[in-house]
C-alpha cells in the first residue's frame, strides 16, 4: 500500500506575478491554509487508523491550530479591509491512499506501516517547507507594496510554520536514523 500525494504547489500563486495586491496575496494564503487543514485532518485519521497515537495527536493538534489560524486570517482581512477573502478553486489533497479504505487496521503489515510513515513524514516536511516559502514570499510582496501591517501579520505565520517545520523535520530525521524501523515507530508512540 502506498501513501497518497498532494498535487498542489502553493508557489503557483506567485508564478510570474509582479505587484500582487494584498487581496490576491491573502487569497493565496487562505487557499493554502484550507488545504493544510485538510492535510492535517487526513494525516490524523491515517495515523489513528495505523494505531500511531502520538503521531495522531501531533496532527490533531496541528489541525486545530491551523483551523484557528485560518479563522484569524479571515478575521484580520475582514476587519482591516471590510471585505471577505475571495474563494479560489483547488484540488482536494489526497493523503490516504484510496485502496486503504477497503481494509481494516489489522490488515496492515509492518512494511505497510513503515512505508506509510516514511511517505507521510516526508510529505509533511515538504508541505511545511512550501508553506514557509509561500509566507516568506507573501511577506516580501506586502513589504514591497507598502502594506507593512499585513506583512507584520504574515510574519507571525512565518514564526508558527518555522516551529512546526522544526518538529516535522526532527520527527522525520529521528525515523530516518532507524531506517523507519516499525518496532521503533511503535515504541515512540508511548
Language model features with spans:
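Iron-associated oxidoreductase/ferritin-like identity signal
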Residues: 2-190
Amino acid at each position: 500500500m502506498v501513501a497518497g500525494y498532494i498535487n498542489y504547489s502553493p508557489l503557483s500563486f506567485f508564478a510570474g506575478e509582479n505587484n500582487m495586491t494584498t487581496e490576491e496575496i491573502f487569497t493565496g494564503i487562505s487557499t493554502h491554509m484550507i488545504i493544510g487543514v485538510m492535510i492535517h485532518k487526513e494525516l490524523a485519521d491515517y495515523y489513528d487508523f495505523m494505531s500511531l497515537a502520538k503521531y495522531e495527536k501531533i496532527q490533531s493538534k496541528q489541525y486545530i491550530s491551523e483551523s484557528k489560524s485560518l479563522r484569524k486570517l479571515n478575521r484580520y482581512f475582514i476587519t482591516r479591509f471590510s471585505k471577505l477573502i475571495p474563494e479560489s478553486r483547488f484540488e482536494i489533497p489526497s493523503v490516504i491512499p484510496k485502496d486503504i479504505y477497503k481494509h481494516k487496521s489489522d490488515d496492515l503489515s509492518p512494511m505497510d506501516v513503515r512505508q506509510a510513515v516514511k511517505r507521510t513524514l516526508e510529505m509533511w516536511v515538504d508541505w511545511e517547507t512550501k508553506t514557509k516559502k509561500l509566507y516568506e514570499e507573501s511577506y516580501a510582496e506586502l513589504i514591497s507594496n507598502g502594506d507593512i501591517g499585513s506583512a507584520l501579520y504574515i510574519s507571525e505565520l512565518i514564526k508558527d510554520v518555522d516551529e512546526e517545520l522544526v518538529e516535522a523535520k526532527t520527527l522525520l530525521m529521528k525515523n530516518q536514523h532507524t531506517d523507519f524501523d516499525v518496532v521503533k515507530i511503535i515504541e515512540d508512540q508511548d
